[in-house]
Regions:
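Short amphipathic alpha-helix that is part of the acyltransferase structural core
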Residues: 1-39, 149-159
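Conserved acetyl-CoA pyrophosphate-binding loop and the N-cap/start of the following alpha-helix
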Residues: 87-96
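A conserved beta-strand-loop-helix scaffold within acyl/acetyltransferase catalytic domains
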Residues: 40-82
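Short, basic/aromatic-enriched C-terminal tail that caps enzymatic domains
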Residues: 4-10, 129-150
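Conserved active-site alpha-helix within GNAT-family acetyltransferase domains
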Residues: 94, 106-141
């Protein structure tokens, strides 16, 4: 599998999926993040499998993470960005976002979006702004299958 790596001092950012420590990612997201608290390991694993992941490492230890959900043509969602507390203040989060946004497969997209409660200044540095016309945007929060209506029944087709 083809992957990219970036080096800065003793830190590396890599898109190599085999290098990701899914247990460490799950631990942070499910217990320390405000946006994914309580998320199951299986859900984290599925999210990573269906995204472009960026692992941040100091030596062999994973110390941060980001992922991009995209169609690689027009749209990308930057999600689950974090750096462990003990490594903050070194510019690693800024570097992680910079590398993610500059990835060769993510250039010339029409729109990037993200959600944040506390890192507005970080993302403003990269050109993100608050939504100017929120009346154009909607979202749907789905607590789980119990609140999701059954899909319409498919009818025949094909040959």
């Amino acid at each position: 599998m083809v992957y990219n790596e970036w080096q800065r001092g003793d830190c590396t950012i890599s898109t190599e999926r085999a290098r990701l420590d899914l247990h460490a990612i799950h631990e942070f997201l499910s217990t320390k993040s405000y946006w994914a608290r309580g998320r199951s390991f299986e859900l984290v694993q599925r999210a990573v499998e269906n995204s472009l992941p960026f692992g941040l490492y100091r030596g062999a230890r994973q110390i941060g993470f980001a992922r991009v959900v995209t169609d690689y043509a027009t749209f990308a969602w930057l999600a689950d960005v974090y750096v462990l507390d003990e490594f903050r203040g070194e510019g690693l989060g800024k570097w992680l976002v910079e590398v993610t946004l500059s990835h060769s497969e993510l250039q010339n997209l029409r729109r990037w979006i993200l959600g944040t409660r506390d890192a507005h200044e970080l993302y403003r540095h990269f050109g993100f702004v608050e939504v100017e016309r929120p009346e154009f945007y909607m979202h749907r929060m789905d607590a789980g299958a119990a609140s999701t209506p059954a899909p319409p029944e498919a009818t025949g087709g094909g040959e």
